[in-house]
Amino acid sequence: MPDPLALAISTGEPAGIGPDITIGALLQLAGQNGHARYHVLGDAHLLASRAAALGVAHAWERRIAEGEVVIHHVPLAVACEPGRLDARNGPYVLSMLDAAIAGCRTHAGAPARFAAMVTAPVQKSTINDAGVPFTGHTEYLAEAAGVPRVVMMLAGPQPAHANAMLRVALATTHLPLRAVADAVTVPLLLETLSIIDADLRRWFGIARPRILVTGLNPHAGESGHMGREEINVIEPALAQARDAGIDARGPYPADTLFQPRHLRDADCVLAMYHDQGLAPLKYGTFGHGVNITLGLPFIRTSVDHGTALDLAGSGQAEHGSMIEAIRSAVTMAGHANGRHASARVPH
């Protein structure tokens, strides 16, 4: 039997629901992933206190004693109360991320300690208030890994096909809408499609990914009458991608692309901007979606929601998205280690 896959889980903003959903997810997953061991990064006292507040202290202690959950103590700067932010704990959040990143990297030929990392939500404002410029997990991980570009992809079960996944990647992420058209260029789309194609093969075991690409304008530009980005940028980028062996199709009108009959044979949809792609995905999958960063040299998954400060310590936080993030990380690591068969028959 192979050694258990070691997953790093950073517990996120200590005043938010990160500790709650980590504890809840790992208790619900008890015994379900016998080939995984969960390395939880965070303040051990905070986690024990939060488990007690949730009424699951004994179950949490048992998971640790059984060895399926391993606590890596990262000390808080100051004591934390659920729901109350403290900028002094901003560096604590980054310390957890740094430990997870270090564990996912190979060193001097030695294998990585962790097969993947899963991140609970962080409060960007707290980190910035601590004097550390921080725009988000994705950008921080890309800089730490030394890669020029990463791609945000969210995934969740297709509402009309319970056994099929809807994956939506973004050409641009956190940009004002007025800046999107200028940001969408042929080189950007080519690089984005290359990353998607490579990581769907590497992490998901898909032999020949099929990528459907949205237009930028209403009705995909209506043959140039509602904008020419489709003609001047997107179509040339898709042609070059196909010449490079990438199965990229489109551009399709975004308002009709997200239908079961179009998505049935798609491995991923590439949307041009944030709300164009994530609004339909979250409508159908919110609370069970997974945020996946493509283009990194290691696997990173996360939840599809924020810190929910008002729910911290209350026992009311849903941990479904954290469960799916953990399961996705296990599956992706399994593909990377050759422990799973290909997810689909080649086209």
Swiss-Prot record:
Gene that this polypeptide is encoded by: pdxA
GO MF: 4-hydroxythreonine-4-phosphate dehydrogenase activity; cobalt ion binding; magnesium ion binding; NAD binding; zinc ion binding
Any one GO CC term of the record: cytoplasm
Enzyme Commission number, as recorded: 1.1.1.262
Zinc-finger as UniProt keyword: no
UniProt protein name: 4-hydroxythreonine-4-phosphate dehydrogenase
Record note on cofactor: Binds 1 divalent metal cation per subunit. Can use ions such as Zn(2+), Mg(2+) or Co(2+).
Family: Belongs to the PdxA family.
Binding site for a divalent metal cation: 174, 219, 274
UniProt enzyme class: oxidoreductase
Pathway(s) annotated for this protein in UniProt: Cofactor biosynthesis; pyridoxine 5'-phosphate biosynthesis; pyridoxine 5'-phosphate from D-erythrose 4-phosphate: step 4/5
Any one GO biological process: pyridoxine biosynthetic process
Subunit: Homodimer.
Compartments, as annotated in UniProt: Cytoplasm
Reactions mediated catalytically: 4-(phosphooxy)-L-threonine + NAD(+) = 3-amino-2-oxopropyl phosphate + CO2 + NADH
NCBIfam families reported for this sequence: pdxA, PRK01909.1
Pfam families in UniProt: PdxA
Keyword Transcription recorded: no
PANTHER family: 4-HYDROXYTHREONINE-4-PHOSPHATE DEHYDROGENASE
Misc: The active site is located at the dimer interface.
Superkingdom of source: Bacteria
Binding site for substrate: 137-138, 282, 291, 300
